[in-house]
Amino acid sequence: MAALQSSFAGLSTSFFGQRFSPPLSLPPLVKSTEGPCLIQAKLKRWERKECKPNSLPVLHKMHVKLGDTVKIISGHDKGKVGEITEIIKHNSKVVVKDVNLKTKHVKSRSEDEPGQIVKIEAPIHSSNVMLYSKEQKVASRVGHKTLDNGKRVRYLIKTGEIIDSAENWKKAVKEKEKTTEAVAAAS
């Protein structure tokens, strides 16, 4: 038994009879960036909630849309107000600008480039956000009504303010295109 233990002890510290040298410890090269977020939190395959028989995810309807101003009603960012920048329909999550920031440690791409610590906006469940009126500074549930011209719109129940307008939607889509072009140009 003693011979077996001594042979295992030799295996753990050597490789074919050669001793390993201790690892060199280099000072960490960490750089914090305060610029625009170029990294997005990707959804892992195992994070899907439900699947259809054809293996596609079930898409859920949500009470918020891209470009809506929302207030966080639960979680560690409770009370913060921000604009929705991305919607993930198959798990009912949204990404709100400057809310739910997570720290991401990014490896260097080449040896001479240092690694980075970057803050990214992680998704938050849509049930934890509520539509917010900038004018009256109040959060409200959403209602649906049909206007005189037959168009269905969303409105805030507390204030009666109509959320859906063509200008807001075009503005949100243009901002989304600008950010994707900036990310594509940077990489």
UniProtKB/Swiss-Prot annotation:
Q: Which UniProt keywords apply?
A: Chloroplast, Plastid, Ribonucleoprotein, Ribosomal protein, RNA-binding, rRNA-binding, Transit peptide
Q: Which InterPro entries match?
A: KOW (IPR005824), Rib_uL2_dom2 (IPR014722), Ribosomal_uL24 (IPR003256), Ribosomal_uL24_CS (IPR005825), Ribosomal_uL24_KOW (IPR041988), Translation_prot_SH3-like_sf (IPR008991)
Q: Which Gene3D superfamilies match?
A: 2.30.30.30
Supply the SMART domains for this chain.
KOW
In chain numbering, the transit peptide falls at: 1-41
A Gene Ontology molecular function term of the record: rRNA binding
Please list the GO biological process terms of this entry: translation
Family membership: Belongs to the universal ribosomal protein uL24 family.
Outline the subunit composition.
Part of the 50S ribosomal subunit.
Purpose: One of two assembly initiator proteins, it binds directly to the 5'-end of the 23S rRNA, where it nucleates assembly of the 50S subunit.
User: Record's HAMAP family?
Assistant: Ribosomal_uL24_B
Q: What is this protein called?
A: Large ribosomal subunit protein uL24c
Taxonomic source organism: Nicotiana tabacum (Common tobacco)
